[in-house]
Regions:
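A generic fold-level signal
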Residues: 1, 9, 47-50, 65-67, ...
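C-terminal substrate-binding subdomain of Rossmann-fold SDR/epimerase-dehydratase oxidoreductases
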Residues: 61-190
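Catalytic helix-loop patch of NAD(P)-dependent Rossmann-fold dehydrogenases
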Residues: 1-38, 42-47
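Conserved sequence/active-site signature of Rossmann-fold short-chain dehydrogenase/reductase
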Residues: 37-39, 51-52, 88
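Conserved active-site helix of classical SDR/Rossmann-fold NAD(P)-dependent CH-OH oxidoreductases
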Residues: 12-19, 52-57, 90, 126
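Alpha-helical segments that scaffold the active site and NAD(P)H-binding pocket
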Residues: 19-24, 56-60, 97
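Active-site phosphate/pyrophosphate-handling residues
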Residues: 13-16, 50, 54, 71, ...
Length: 190
């Protein structure tokens, strides 16, 4: 997808750099690849933020100003996975503290030292909008602007590797949205 091209290239470059250093210098770098992140300190700008923080702000402002109908980009049918940022931090600590014998399985010449970090759960954007509206308290109508893009139809990481090692996200999406909204309010109102 064109809008994510530079980001994708940067991610691939990071993975390849880790792999090359491991082979050439005997390092033991792992590239932890997260799914869509959200949480404290997020960017809630309506023009250049990711979908979840943008929805928090858009629905909050609609509620506060009494707007009865809002329009959301796309069809709402795209599927996404979300991970609370604190969970990514915990996943990285988990990986850093893996026993040597489990860590050794990551390092070979046939596979890059990459591990996906996600929840393994996805939902459609239309369901995400309902969850955010519920947390924010927006009771108006939502319409879909089909002239705007949905983006990639589905973004779900295969997180089986980290799950099989025993790691699981601690913060579910409903709880995470509530915590993100609290963060938004503390920053928005100041």
């Amino acid at each position: 997808e064109l809008t994510n091209r530079a980001y994708a290239v940067a991610k691939i470059a990071g993975i390849e750099t880790c792999w090359a250093h491991n082979r050439q210098h005997g390092t033991r770098y792992i590239a932890a690849m997260p799914t869509n992140l959200y949480g404290p300190g997020d960017n809630y700008d309506l023009e250049n933020s990711h979908v979840l923080p943008a929805l928090i702000r858009k629905l909050h402002e609609a509620k506060e100003s009494g707007v009865l109908k809002i329009s959301i980009w796309g069809t709402g049918l795209a599927w996404r996975e979300f991970l609370y940022s604190d969970d990514l931090g915990e996943a990285c600590l988990f990986l850093l503290n893996l026993p040597k014998r489990e860590l050794d399985s990551f390092f070979n010449d046939r596979r890059p030292p990459l591990i996906n970090v996600g929840t393994g759960m996805e939902l459609q954007i239309r369901d995400l909008v309902l969850k955010v509206a519920n947390v924010v308290g927006y009771e108006g109508e939502v319409s879909w602007d089909h002239s705007r893009p949905d983006g990639t139809p589905r973004k779900l990481l295969d997180n089986s590797l980290i799950a099989n090692l025993g790691w699981k996200a601690a913060i579910d999406l409903d709880q995470g949205i509530q915590m993100a909204y609290t963060d938004f309010l503390s920053r928005y109102e100041s």
